[in-house]
């Protein structure tokens, strides 16, 4: 038996002159469904193996043909689970917004990842949305103090009775590096597991990266918000950890029978896909998802009924350059084979 709930989540990106911004967080985690909820991609039922999730583009979408390359690129980026730093690139797009960067963020939501910052859903003023994602606690009011360093989202933030929703690496609370094993033995949501002296889960936004970790132009993809003339097309350790932690399955231990490997596939211009890209009838860009508790896995939810939506009237930049690694040509393979043969001849001659 599966328990369903009709929670409908609409997650929007906000554009402004300032950036609205850690460890990773999951959609549906909170006071209603449980603080420790882990969300999994559609189709996961608690058994191991390859978990295929498809991404398609609604044929009626205004810019469908222009979205194809970016959709394929996002599939490869997520499947690679490659950790990068310096993933923010500033370019001249004549005031356009990079569609591929936005799509990568929204597909992350459809796979179960939440914003890692307080974001617009907190209803906080924009200047406070970079605080790490949390509930507002028993007093029903966010407790926000940037601590001695004055940097919002850092390890010395004082958050009162706010309940942390952001999973962190227990060894060092560093959201910009990845543990060799990603599961409940290396990551936690419980503040009692923080390194000695740390008060809260560290936020992975660009200011924290630059000022506290000496990492320029680096920010988690799952932070809310995007600048004009900015590319963010690769994942950070934050983002990869969120995907891999979920892959450790219902027991949250890597290397056991319930582990899965996410494989995102591009389905084409079709609505016959698990995640479908659509035109938005209101809002710049957002994902809409519901979820279902998984039998035998308390606190584990799988995504269902997913869609990502984009304003067709927005000033989008549609990337037409593939990120696929080119296959070596037959001539190059022949040349490589000849070189190996020549080396072998010299060694035996």
Name these PLM-found stretches.
Residues 7-16:
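Bacterial N-terminal signal peptides
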Residues 17-324:
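Zinc-dependent metalloendopeptidases
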